[in-house]
């Protein structure tokens, strides 16, 4: 697939997500969380292209959190943002030391790291008056999270394309919700984004997610529609076919 075809495909699916879930309103100030990875770079690049087209009227801002990880170098990232004329701020907060201190060696850092990062993101967005916080999770993240929640937590849940935070102060959006990771990888390679590796957890493999990813891949070899059907299932819920006591009062579920 050519460079333009990949970009066109991704923009199509981002626009579809924006429209299906009413993610961005006219006049919104959208804060894109840029981690330095392929997903967040792709999100920022595509949203910026859509903004420049002019059919969606919103402002965009890149928020980068420097977590004081060893070897962190954002010079190329700064150059890329300057070249694209995207306003940004790189905020330094030493969450790295906290995570290393609190989490025993060999354990996964992701949970604590994400909680600390989320708190900083929320505070910054509120202080600066941003109306939307954009995250780079894509289709593969959503369906993998669904199975991980079922297999390991006993819950039917995932990552919604649009979410009101628990404190009701922030709206999170995931414009890449319909985009496949393989297309994002192609796009990131073509764009030659100056990626920044995560030295905190980048070397740690999330074994649960890797197993689920392999399972979905194996099933897709037998039936290519499996991933898209899983995504469709997230918006095609049949509560009457489930067994949640919070949805139904089974004691009183009788024929009159």
UniProtKB/Swiss-Prot annotation:
Any single GO BP term: tRNA thio-modification
Gene3D superfamilies noted in UniProt: HUPs
Pathway where it operates: tRNA modification
Main location group: cytoplasm
Keyword tRNA-binding attributed: yes
Residues that bind [4Fe-4S] cluster: 110, 113, 201
Entry's Gene Ontology molecular function annotations: 4 iron, 4 sulfur cluster binding; ATP binding; magnesium ion binding; sulfurtransferase activity; tRNA binding
Enzyme Commission number(s) from the entry: 2.8.1.-
Disulfides per UniProt: none
Family (UniProt): Belongs to the TtcA family.
Note: The thiolation reaction likely consists of two steps: a first activation step by ATP to form an adenylated intermediate of the target base of tRNA, and a second nucleophilic substitution step of the sulfur (S) atom supplied by the hydrosulfide attached to the Fe-S cluster.
NCBIfam families linked to this entry: PRK10696.1
HAMAP family named among the record's database cross-references: TtcA
Protein name: tRNA-cytidine(32) 2-sulfurtransferase
